[in-house]
Amino acid sequence: MEPTQEQIKALVAKLNEATLKEVITIETREVESLALTDSKFGGYPYVPKDGRIPRDSEGNPFFMVAQINCEQLPENSIYPKKGLLQFWIIDGDDLFGLDLQNPCSNAGKRILYFPKPTDGLSLDEVKLQYVLTEEYTPMTPYKELALTFTKREEGITLSDVNFDRFFTDMWNETFSDKIETIWDLPQETRELLGELLPEGAEHRIGGYPYFTQQDPREEDSPFTELLLQMDSDGDHIMWGTMGVANFFINKKDLQNCNFEEVLYNWDC
């Protein structure tokens, strides 16, 4: 006997409760100017007095897609309490720095962390360094978007690589009609799950990811923490054709503020 819709809804509620994670959602807005240390998508970065903008092997500057000022986030257990985290990708590359063979490679992306940002270069000094050569980026070069953060809790998304395993185990514990994968379910049941489960299609820090294609991680991947997700908005941000970018990190590395090994992916 097939489970009823009410029984399936109860199962999804149980799964959601069992997989709750903290997530910080991000809304953007256009502004005239932001401080160099403000949270932002795009725009001009904070650069220490003795620092330099990251560059590729030919000496061309990377493009900063995001800067997060940790002190501007709501109280959370995801990010460091203080400092600036910057996300950079290579300019002038059709894949926006994505390495399909080694998504943790830093050849096409960099994550920089400044635990105690002191007085840095002035805007004029930053502009002298930050001159993009190709301007082939997912955002209009130099245009900046201010960020507003909201914290909540949310269960696993349908896109997450571990969803099928978690859901299948819970289904088989609950119902006599056993399955090996979610794809063993009737189409109408899968459609109902799509309506009930969080999609995660938004800019976010933490929580579970969203993909337009599929999760690049293997099951039980050590890259469990969603450091940042940037969605396309059709207006100011465009990853390919309405795609989404994700940056994942090992939980221990995040706790130790070690951002050398971050898994970067985007798809559309």
What are the residue ranges of the model-derived segments?
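Preference for intrinsically disordered or flexible, low-complexity segments
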Residues: 1-268
